[in-house]
Amino acid sequence: MEPIKVGIVGFGRSGCGIHASAIKDMRDMFDVVAIADFIPERRSHEAFPNAKPYASAEALIADPNVEMVIVSTFNSMHAPVARMALKGGKHVLCEKPFGFTTADVDSMIAEAKAAGKVLQPFQQRRFEEDFQKVRSIIRSGILGKISYIQICWDGFGRRWDWQTSRQYGGGQLYNNMPHLVDHAMELFGDGEPEVQCMVASSLSIGPAEDEVHLTLTGKDKPIIRAELMATNPYARERWCVCGTNGGLHGGTKKLEWKYVDWSKMPKRVVDMTPLEGRVYCSEKLEWTTDSWEPVTAADAGAGAKPAPGPTKQLYLSLYDAIRKGTPQLITAEAVRRRIAVL
């Protein structure tokens, strides 16, 4: 099969550093044939010397040689450029945020259906090994009924780029929180959560938030807290999971968990008689422990560059969806739930 001919709109940290870097190692599946950026010196890449340079998204989308458009512009332009590309008959991969509102998402989905094209949200961190391992352990039931999940991305440092301004839709709520919310909603499961959220601008030079504290709750659901901080020099572990049989903790480089088999423990009933010797309830727990380390570990935290593996997995899924017609592993409809939370 022929490689998919790709045009990238917005060739900055994401367009160049993430997407072009992934595609250059997948040349049998994807080929960058066009690059658009409002900064002239950004319209080229040494790995794709034949890519046509364009000054605007409109010009790139009008290129009949482009089959798929990667939208990696300022946040505020994601939905408008994606809709424009779909109307132009192109497949679309849209960076996060996948729009600001559910109306944005609905309009993109409608354009994709009308054009008969694939619309792919870039939620590649769904493929991260630590997340997938945490999800599999929770689903196995060994930790019992899950009561609490905490997901933390901590760091300490200032930013002064466009992501700290509201002008182009900056701020951590729509920059990195889409990844945490994606993980949180996957672990929340079916149904719509009650949402509480607090944000703050602490170290960023601009007014946009650099700290987000979000809580999801629901009937018969665990409390899920997703927190992103720019003022924590003592970064917390990414994962903390608590259940009725045990718990889990760790991050991208190692996870540990332990649990109790209550069927092997003495059966207890409520005893209203004061305990002899004025002691507190105490019993010896027989723990089963386990741990996991990935083959290749990624850095954690809000400022860490994404690991290449999950990005390539998403691109493999996208290639199969476009060339072979296989179902997408991450759909626009699924990501719509995340946008509703945000």
Model-derived features with residue positions:
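Active-site beta-strand termini and strand-to-loop segments that position acidic
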Residues: 214-221, 241-243
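Rossmann-fold dehydrogenase core element
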Residues: 107-124, 145-149
